[in-house]
Amino acid sequence: MQFKRFLALGDSMTEGMSDVVFNGKYRGWADRTAEVMAANWPDFTYANFAVRGKLVGQVVRDQIPMALPFIEGRSTLVSFHAGANDVIRPKYDPNKTIATYNEGVDILTRAGATLALFCVLEDTGAKTRAAKVWQERFAIFNENVRRRAASVG
């Protein structure tokens, strides 16, 4: 499918934090993907709304409303990655985080966009107590992402 537009929503993973620095700015996977798409598809447009450190509720509340006016059906690709910053918090509430994530997916699906959803690395290889807790949390979170991805195609 040829996309007319790519909208990137989320946190540091999508913003490009800690990726290649170009002219003093991060240039992450979303920027590089958009560059290739723009080179191959005429009249292609791109916007990256992602901001490092954002929680899933902030992405749903702040970024999705900004992106909605730019969605023009299935020809708009929207990447949605949020929730990892919630998962690593001491007072993580899996039910709330997953429900909010699902709300974001539902809003974007109703808008008619083609969605790209992403899982988080579950096992970093670290053997600390915190790493074990995060692995368990991310496994549950990722299972929800996989279910939602399957449900929206």
Region roles according to the model:
Residues 25-28, 57-58, 136:
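A short linear-motif detector with a strong N-terminal bias
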Residues 1-52, 65-74:
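Serine-esterase "nucleophile elbow" of acetyl-processing enzymes
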Residues 51-56, 85-86:
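Active-site neighborhood of divalent metal-dependent phosphoester/pyrophosphate hydrolases
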Residues 46, 57, 127-128:
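Generic signal for short, ordered secondary-structure residues
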Residues 54-64:
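Structural motif
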Residues 41, 62-153:
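Alpha-helical cap/lid subdomain in secreted, periplasmic
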